């Protein structure tokens, strides 16, 4: 659903932000 889609986007954003370079 909509919340699931938002969760995927936020999760991916946080994963990229927290990922060590």
Swiss-Prot record:
Transmembrane stretches, start-end: none
Gene Ontology terms for molecular function: nitric-oxide synthase regulator activity
One BP term from GO: negative regulation of nitric-oxide synthase activity
Disulfide linkage: none
Tissue expression profile of the protein: Expressed by the skin dorsal glands.
Alphabetically ordered keywords of this record: Amphibian defense peptide, Secreted
InterPro entries attached to this UniProt entry: Frog_Litoria
Subcellular location: Secreted
GO cellular component: extracellular region
Classification via Pfam families: Antimicrobial24
Main localisation: secreted
Record keyword Signal present: no
Role noted for this protein: Has no antimicrobial activity. Strongly inhibits the formation of NO by neuronal nitric oxide synthase at micromolar concentrations.
The protein's name: Dahlein-5.4
